[in-house]
UniProtKB/Swiss-Prot annotation:
Record gene name: mrpl25
The organism's place on the tree of life at top rank: Eukaryota
Gene Ontology annotations for the cellular component aspect, listed alphabetically: mitochondrial large ribosomal subunit
Protein name per the record: Large ribosomal subunit protein mL59
Purpose of the protein: Component of the mitochondrial ribosome (mitoribosome), a dedicated translation machinery responsible for the synthesis of mitochondrial genome-encoded proteins, including at least some of the essential transmembrane subunits of the mitochondrial respiratory chain. The mitoribosomes are attached to the mitochondrial inner membrane and translation products are cotranslationally integrated into the membrane.
GO MF annotations in UniProt: structural constituent of ribosome
Family of the protein in this entry: Belongs to the mitochondrion-specific ribosomal protein mL59 family.
Record flagged with keyword Coiled coil: no
InterPro entries associated with the record: Ribosomal_mL59 (IPR037507), Ribosomal_mL59_dom (IPR040922)
Location of region: Disordered: 33-53
């Protein structure tokens, strides 16, 4: 028993200070002391906001408060936790690998703007290029007939200049 506690302490001390501080402020239920109820055994930080990665609604004013950790800081913490193999100890966040994989499976490899009836914006010259080149190709294919007709009618009587 004492050996496992020593190992856990040694593992905790091997974590980087930022991750260690975070886990001390917001300990997950899995590392609480034996017999402690997660609902009653809370740190002052957890009482203020149970999940520091999610926005909270003020109980009196009803106003929403930003998360304690910004998305950038969340991503940094998740990366640190992944490097040290303690990612499952973090509270829920959109930056967790499981959440990213779930979203990727749910939405697929979609690109915004390529749905049914949607076009990828692009520049106007890029969007009209295909139609313009097709029109040019048709004009080039019709060119021998146009030249023959021009030679027959002559310069003076020619009225069908291509627009």
């Amino acid at each position: 028993m004492a050996a496992t506690v020593k190992q856990h302490v040694q593992l905790a001390l091997s974590l980087p200070p930022r991750l260690r501080t975070f886990l001390a402020r917001y300990p997950p239920a899995s590392i609480l002391p034996a017999g402690a109820d997660p609902e009653t055994h809370k740190t002052p930080y957890q009482e203020e906001s149970p999940n520091p990665f999610m926005p909270t609604k003020h109980p009196i004013t009803g106003k929403w408060h930003n998360p304690k950790y910004s998305l950038r800081r969340q991503a940094e913490l998740v990366k640190l936790a992944q490097e040290h193999g303690v990612e499952e100890l973090l509270p829920f966040t959109r930056k967790l690998n499981e959440e990213k994989l779930r979203k990727r499976v749910e939405l697929g490899l979609r690109v915004k703007g390529t749905g049914v009836g949607e076009k990828v914006k692009g520049h106007k010259h890029e969007r009209t290029l295909v139609a313009k080149m097709e029109k040019r190709r048709e004009a080039m294919l019709a060119m021998p007939d146009l030249i023959r007709e021009w030679k027959k009618v002559g310069k003076r009587n020619w009225t069908k200049f291509p627009k």
